[in-house]
Amino acid sequence: MNTKRVAVALAVLAALFSSGVQQADACTRATYIGPDNMVVTGRTMDWKEDIMSNIYVFPRGIQRAGYNKGETVKWTSKYGSVIATGYDIGTCDGMNEKGLVASLLFLPESIYDRPGDTRPTMGISIWTQYVLDNFATVREAVDELKKETFRIDAPQMPNGSASTLHLAITDETGNTAILEYLNGELNIHESKEYQVMTNSPRYEYQLAINDYWKEVGGLQMLPGTNRSSDRFVRASFYIHAIPQTADAKIAVPSVLSVMRTVSVPFGITTPDKPHISSTRWRSVSNQKDKVYYFESTLTPNLFWLDLKKIDFSPKAAVKKLALTNGEIYAGDAVKDLKDSSSFTFLFQTPVL
């Protein structure tokens, strides 16, 4: 590790421990890259209250708009997807039929606005869905997104929290891109090496911190708090330490075990540490075999949706797995999907 990155890491660590700024919510994401094209991505959803998530299946051929008034981006979905919502007003996680996984996580440093920006508008609630609808690979997505042809509109969430978020996308080859809006500019980090993402600080600083802990050595000591930077280091160590295997029966549970390792126990409340939020659910995407796994903290079973068994043709209906009333599913849940209308994406102005 070079001297400059050591200096950056130490400076950021000092700032994190001395700062009075607390993160309200948190999540962790990690991608496993194994032999024989075995790629598995897991994430936790950590939130200070029930985020009222449901699972939806979207077919191809849906006509969408990135905003509900004025000049916006419009498209027709090329790919079907399985997604998880937040508050049933936006897509926060999912995988499309090509094995592209997209995950939206909290980033308090996000600033989307540029002075006098007149570009077409894209709502933050539909940004993740835009990626899943339109791209099969990270390279395709990055080539288009780096053009910055739209601006992001980010209204407050239903609970009043700021929609300060960043997006991670990973394709079936294991290539990942981290997308962060900082001071109105889109910053993109793309590499197969970028296997882990959490929250604050901005991604380049997280990489520097992780470099520092690599020098310490995970077998000697790992940071154990629920801080974003500590979870990043633990997830990074374990995602590389678990067995290298082409067997999905080993790879998927291994990634799930990493996600459990970085989860925050349910019901944890620490008055002087409001940045600690309970893990509400975990997802794991087997991108080689196109299977989306989901585990709620409050239900006893893991369930999954095999995308190969789902009809994504344009004539197919939108389908839903309801999760907000204590529903319990186990194993292959394709049979439990019900025809449904879509949820309404949240934009700055009310949809009339």
Please annotate each region the language model reported.
Residues 147-184:
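Catalytic cofactor-binding cores of redox enzymes
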Residues 25-31, 35-39, 153-155, 162-163, ...:
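C-terminus-biased signal that marks the final domain/tail of proteins
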Residues 121-154, 248-257:
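Proteins synthesized as precursors that undergo proteolytic processing into mature forms
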Residues 1-10:
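Bacterial N-terminal signal peptides that target proteins for export
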Residues 40-42, 101-104, 168-170, 178, ...:
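Structural recognition of the beta-strand scaffold that forms the well-ordered cores
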Residues 33-36, 96-98, 171-174, 180-185, ...:
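Short acidic-glycine loop/turn motifs at beta-strand connectors
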Residues 25-119, 152, 330-331, 336:
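A contiguous strand-loop segment
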